[in-house]
Design a protein with these regions (language model features):
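Acidic, proline/glycine-rich low-complexity IDRs
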Residues: 65-120
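An N-terminal amphipathic alpha-helical segment
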Residues: 1-70
Length: 120
């Protein structure tokens, strides 16, 4: 079985926390400095800035042990997309978001990513 520390860790993956900086909705832990760097890198494109700052690689959830299979990563990615969509809707009912999971078969295992950005 697991333990309480693992349960709390998984809760933060499947039901993440957010912060708002300059009207960007970002995963908790994001900084103003990182935001400014990504704004510069994206030429001020708000959608691209949010998308890159909010993306996660599903295969990076666990960094030790056996590499996950494509089926495992795609299953978790789909589930995380559903929970992320629900969390954003619950926490920001007045905003619209695009939540995207790269769910194509045959990708490199590290290319399965989940991200979100505000739809304007």
């Amino acid at each position: 079985m697991g333990n309480y520390e693992l349960a709390i860790g998984y809760s933060l993956i499947f039901w993440p926390r957010f912060i708002v900086i300059d009207d960007y909705v970002l995963r908790a832990g994001s900084t103003v400095e990182a935001l400014r760097n990504f704004e510069e890198a994206t030429g001020g494109d708000r959608r691209a800035t949010e998308a890159v700052m909010n993306h996660i690689h599903i295969a990076d959830i666990h960094t030790s042990g056996a590499e996950p299979s494509e089926a495992q990563v795609r299953y978790l990615g789909r589930l995380m997309k559903e929970t992320l969509t629900a969390k954003l809707k619950a926490e920001f009912p007045d905003r619209s978001f695009v939540v995207r999971f790269t769910d194509e078969p045959g990708l490199d295992i590290t290319d399965y990513e989940l991200t979100f950005w505000q739809q304007v």
